[in-house]
Amino acid sequence: MASIQPCKICGSVEQSVLYRGPVRSGRFGQSSINLQTVWLCGGCGAGYLPSQAVDYASAEYRMLVDGSDAPEDFYRLHDGEQVEKLRMLGTGSLRDMVLMDVGCGAGSFLDLAKGFCKTTIGIEPTPSFQEALAKKKHEVFPYCHEVPDVWEGQVDVAVSFSVIEHLEDPLAFLKDIRRLLRPGGRLLLSTPNRKDWLLEFLPDDYARFFYRTVHTWYFDAEALSKLVLLAGFADPAVSHLHRYDLSNALLWLRDKRPTGLGTLKTGGGGGCIFPWHA
């Protein structure tokens, strides 16, 4: 029997089983052949799925994440999400600033924010995405630890959307970002919530979709706050945002499958009110 390895975030060896079963390997309906175990750290509260060696720059990895490594497909999937992200930051907080997007993909957010910023930096290992970023005059580097020292302490705002859950060492990842931020600089970080309420309502059907071979880590608000504090950041503030709308949630409950945004029309007669709480 393999010995328990210390948590890579907090070093604790206190672990329990968070989930055991099939996990998603690619798109909906594609599952791992073998049952997988997601562990819950008793020290920091993070969930952890032991991963295999990963080449983040490979086309095969992008196929598992989004089904394609083509910039055009990335834009089609993600352009519609960017306005809400910009609203969360506020355009005034970006004007004449140095903005760094870590794990930026083909650059949907950077493209939107570029008109406000003094400099935009994209951190992205995928070659096809790097080429698209360079064509749009973003500064491009594959990883934070490969950014030249000239940028150390020069970044005003860093963002990283749905990236940290993919990594083997999230603590080192955040420390690398912090090295590049100026004193008082800000980081906006997003990740799926491991306390997603659909896991309560559909513990079997939704769990095998929620847990993924490409997601090594699973955080709730408390675990994420502990992580950023350990990385040296101060005053973490957590808010909850539903990435997909009410229609997607309702159709999950009815059909037990994802449907995306705006599939079900919830307006109309009856005077119904749908309370929606984070």
Predicted regions and their residues:
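A short glycine-rich, Lys/Arg-flanked "PGG" loop and its adjoining helix->strand segment in the class I
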Residues: 171-186
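Conserved N-terminal segment of class I S-adenosyl-L-methionine
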Residues: 1-161, 171-174, 240-241, 266-277
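Conserved catalytic loop of SAM-dependent methyltransferase domains
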Residues: 21-25, 236-263
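Short N-terminal helix/helix-N-cap motif within the alpha/beta-hydrolase-1
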Residues: 168-172, 199
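Short, glycine-/aromatic-enriched active-site segment of Class I SAM-dependent methyltransferases
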Residues: 20-25, 189-217, 222-227, 251-252
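Hydrophobic/aromatic residues located in beta-strands of well-ordered beta-sheets
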Residues: 120, 187-189
